Every structure is written in C-alpha cells, then in structure tokens.
Amino acid sequence: MDSFFSTYVLPAIIMIGQSLLLLVCLLVFIAYVLLADRKIWAAVQLRRGPNVVGPFGLFQSFADLLKFVFKEPIIPAGANKAVFLLAPLVTVLLALSTWAVVPLADGWVIANINVGILYIFAISSLEVYGIIMGGWASNSKYPFLGALRSAAQMVSYEVSIGFVIVTVLLCVGSLNLTDIVNAQHTGLGTVLGLPASFLDWHWLSLFPMFIVFFISALAETNRPPFDLPEAESELVAGFMVEYGSSPYMMFMLGEYAAVCLMCALTTILFLGGWLPPVDIWILNWVPGIIWFTLKACLVFFMFAMVKAFVPRYRYDQLMRLGWKVFLPLSLAMVIIVAFVLKLMGWA
C-alpha cells in the first residue's frame, strides 16, 4: 500500500499542486499583462489609461473580471447554444494547457517532455477550432467572417513558425525546451572567442528567423497589425460580436494566454530563456525565473509597441506576406542553416 501511494498517488498530488500553482500565477500575470497593454497604448496616445481602481489602476483587470462574472450571458435566438458556450471554453483550456511544458527556469517545469516544442505547436494549432466554433455557432455573418479569416490566418503563419522550429532543431538537436535554452550557453560569441553572453543566444546567429518568428507570432495570436479576425472597424468585433459576460472573458483570457505563450517561446528559442545576459557571478546569483520574466516582458513590450504604432494590414497584404515572403524566407533559412552546419561538421 505504501509503495502504491509513493509510486502513483503522491506524484499525482504533487503534479496537481504544481499545475494549480502555475495556473494561479499565470492568471495573475495575464491580468497585469492586459493592464500593461492598455497602459502602453494610452501612453503612446498621451493618455493616462486605467488609473482609478487601486493605486495607479493596478486592480483594474480584477475589477473587469468581477464585472464579466456577474453580468448575465446573453445567447442569440438563432445560435447553437451548446457549441456557442463550448467555443470559449475550448479556446481557454487549449491556451492554458500549453504551459505545462514551458520551463520557467532550470527544472521549473511541470512536464519536461522530449518533444515539448512539438506539443506546443500541436496544441496551439487546435485553438483555431474554438474560434471557428464560436463564429459558426453565433449564426451571424460578422462572427462567421471573422472565424474564416482567423482560420486562414493561423494556418498560413503556422507554416512559417514550423520552419523556424525546424531551424532551431537543426542547431540544437533536440525538441526539449530545456535543452534548447542550455544549448545557448555557447554560440556565435563563443566561436568568436568572446566570453559567454547574450551574443551566444540564437537571436544573433538566427536573426532572420527571429524576425520571422516575432511577426508570425503577432499573426498567430491575432495581435495588431494582424487583428483581421476581430477588426473593430470592419467586422465590429469579429468572431466575438455576439459574446458577452463570462464567455467573452474566456475568449480574452485565451487570447492573452496565447500572447504570453508566444512571448515565453520567443524568450526560450532566441533570447536564452533564464540565462543571464553575461555569464558573471553577480548576474548568475539572480534567480533564473527573474531573467525569464524580464525577457518575456521585454518581448511583450515590443508586441504592445507594434500595436500602438503599426496600422492594420489589409487581408490580401496579410496573406501575401505569409505565403510569398515568410514561407520562402523561412524555407531558404532552413536549407542555409543545414548546409552551414554540415559544412562546419556540426551536423
């Protein structure tokens, strides 16, 4: 009995506790990411942004949460009720489940599987089904158009993201996210005879792929300037037109969870994860999760600045960029990286 408890029950209890802790921390982080998004946008427009609820508006997201929870959900008369309510739940559950394999520091991961990046890519690809379900079940033309746009957009840019992942796989030789970070201890800077630093991270040696991944991440998460599925000036609010109260909140939660995931992936694949900028003792003393969080926040700041400055693309421009620019570029980089690695004997 003791053997059964220590072998099966105790590890399950520990994993459930870790999952709940990660979920709570992630939800709080998303709340402040949403606030930061609104604050940065307001600052660019010379406004103050949310500043009433709590000091400097720090509790605004929690006030919005309570507002959505206590509002009455309204379901359109012609909607498919079951699918209409299931769609936001599918979206938010898929977005949150991807975080199970994301290492926040060395050893800080719930499931350290060998195909972590492939797992994230597969689960992220399924999120489009929640949007399609919501757009179709609403029985309205604007949500359906937004859902169709979202499906085409996410499929188009997943191809480029896939080639970026292949490039990183060629350089590292592993799909394990922890191995990808640890491989960035040495890189281009070390080859040039420099001490271990941020010059070893993949952002420099794979700079074109870093740009492709960053822009594709914007499109994959429906962020401006690629927010065509929910374009306010064209489709009112796209696939979320008919949603309100808790279902709308779940769609927004899933969207920002996906945004935070892309920031974390950018940090892991190209910015050294939890590694310090320079390998010296005083920076190594700082916990890795702090470096990881700071880098992810920097990437999100770039996301927010793009939203504030770059106008929305037309739909044909969006498709042309994905298929005629990013796809050939990413495919060419895969071939070039493979050739260079083979030429230098690193393959």
Curated annotation (Swiss-Prot):
How would you describe this protein's topology in the membrane? Multi-pass membrane protein
Where in or outside the cell it occurs: the entry states:
Cell inner membrane
State which residue ranges cross the membrane: 13-33, 50-70, 82-102, 115-135, 161-181, 198-218, 263-283, 286-306, 321-341
Q: Please give the superkingdom of this protein's source.
A: Bacteria
User: Quaternary structure per UniProt?
Assistant: NDH-1 is composed of 14 different subunits. Subunits NuoA, H, J, K, L, M, N constitute the membrane sector of the complex.
**Task performed by this protein:** NDH-1 shuttles electrons from NADH, via FMN and iron-sulfur (Fe-S) centers, to quinones in the respiratory chain. The immediate electron acceptor for the enzyme in this species is believed to be ubiquinone. Couples the redox reaction to proton translocation (for every two electrons transferred, four hydrogen ions are translocated across the cytoplasmic membrane), and thus conserves the redox energy in a proton gradient. This subunit may bind ubiquinone.
* Family to which this protein belongs: Belongs to the complex I subunit 1 family.
The name this protein carries in UniProt is NADH-quinone oxidoreductase subunit H 1
Organismal lineage? Bacteria, Pseudomonadati, Pseudomonadota, Alphaproteobacteria, Hyphomicrobiales
